[in-house]
Amino acid sequence: MAEKENYDHPVYKHVKDIKDADAVAWAFVNKNKMVQFPFKFPEVGPDEIRINTLYAGLCQSDVHTVREIWGPCLYPMAPGHEIIGEVAIVGSNVKDFKKGDLVGFGTLRTCCEKCEYCVKGKENLCREVPEVFTYGKYWGGYATAMQQPAKFFFKLPPGFKLEKGAPLFCAGITTFYPLEKFLEPEMKVCGVIGCGGLGHMAIQFLHKLGHEVVAFTTSENKKDLLKKLGADKIVISKDDAQMKAAATTIDFMVNTIPSNNTNFNKYISCIKRGGKLIQVGMPAFDDEMRINVNMLVSCEIEILGSCVGPRKPTDKMVDFCAKNDVYPIVEEFPFEKIPEAFEKLENGRPFFRCVVNMKDFAEKNGLKK
């Protein structure tokens, strides 16, 4: 029996003719089917902005969302939380943005501004309002335009590379923020576990910040590229001899691997006494990490989690990347080939990050408004 296809949405109105649409999304109408979805927005609210999407990154979190790995999904769903755009319409209360501004937008879309976390500048930990994240009923970057609260847009500085910058608003801040929060100056030797979309960003940040970087990877064929990105040493983690040689050499370790099938103890054994392991890779909600507690206690090793990042560190990251030419390696796809990019992402074959050029399709179809 075929799965039901849902075209009714509580916020966005599906229209049949693209000429009547404000935008077109690639939306999932059920767990397994993605379609081009012309739609109309509600009126822009006083505290909102509508942008024309220029570039949108694809993230593994999109897969987790629409495949319901992280729980029930509201269909139709147009995901995407790595977004570069141009401001098209500004709400009446919005003072910090104007039409034509180039902006970025990421995983967080709103917060309460009042809870104990918000008042400390930790909006990423706010759970006091619904739809904090760009994963729910308010659509994201898989559409030629997007409408969201103004307070989580970020102005882009002159010289910012628009075609490469979208993944910075997820992969970038996910790896930049824990360095801001947890990395101490005396921690000179830093390791990165997993050298994919997140890991290759962590390597670049650590290198530009002046640390010695050790990259842990299973991919022999990435060695030369990782060195160009800033890795001082490459450890092939499936090689027992190399892992043994790396024992107790790392002050600060960033783990980008989300899988619960990983033998974390072999990585923990590489951390110095008093060192830190920062977990940023996020698996399914019921996955667990198995570790040797004796090793943690006897060596006073800290394990810490980090969830994307608040607004101030994101602004700082944007400026840092523009000034230091730190960007992800991306494969670019046209809007028409989002399903192809998504399939490549889901099957673990992108060359670091997939980015979709949204602007060409929008301009060709009269959707830039």
Where are these regions (language model features)?
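Adenosine-nucleotide cofactor-binding segment
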Residues: V189-C195, H207-K266
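Glycine-rich phosphate-binding loop and adjacent beta-alpha segment
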Residues: L209-H211, P258-I329, M358-K369
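N-terminal Rossmann-fold NAD(P) dinucleotide-binding loop
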Residues: G199-H200
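NAD(P)H dinucleotide-binding glycine-rich loop of Rossmann-like/cofactor-binding domains
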Residues: P38, C111-I193
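C-terminal hydrophobic helical "lid"/dimerization subdomain
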Residues: A2-A21, K208, N265, R311-K369
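Glycine-rich beta-strand-centered segment in the early N-terminal region that forms part
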Residues: K40-A56, I69-E116, P157-F160
